[in-house]
């Protein structure tokens, strides 16, 4: 699996939302500026995440996007699934001779894939947030809102 720009930017934006006081809404412009993400691209990503129920959108002067659930309830697996990212570590094989010849290798890849997917669904935005804060503290950095 390859982490795409779409996935990377989405996780950065969602972590930014997790940093909002009381998880309140933040505008696309504010998130884009803090995270160095192109605004129009970020808007498309947030629309996709809204349709998947990961964020809520609010209109008006104090509107913007906010997490639909607490950060400890949103996993990396959910985010990637919402973006329709492929989690497949190997090409799809048909029922031909090559599959029979490679069954041992494919079995290992399938087991690794299952463990990988399980790990993605066990890592939450809260985990990433605390990992980032721990790293910053170890580096002697203050609170930094750039993820």
Curated annotation (Swiss-Prot):
Gene Ontology CC: one annotated term: cytosol
Disulfide cross-links: none
UniProt entry keywords in alphabetical sequence: DNA-binding
Pfam families associated with the record: Rrf2 (PF02082)
Ranges where the HTH rrf2-type domain occurs: 2-130
Record SUPFAM superfamilies: Winged helix' DNA-binding domain
GO molecular function (one): DNA-binding transcription factor activity
InterPro entries membership: TR_Rrf2-type_CS (IPR030489), Tscrpt_reg_Rrf2 (IPR000944), WH-like_DNA-bd_sf (IPR036388), WH_DNA-bd_sf (IPR036390)
Gene Ontology biological process: regulation of DNA-templated transcription
Name of protein: Putative HTH-type transcriptional regulator slr0846
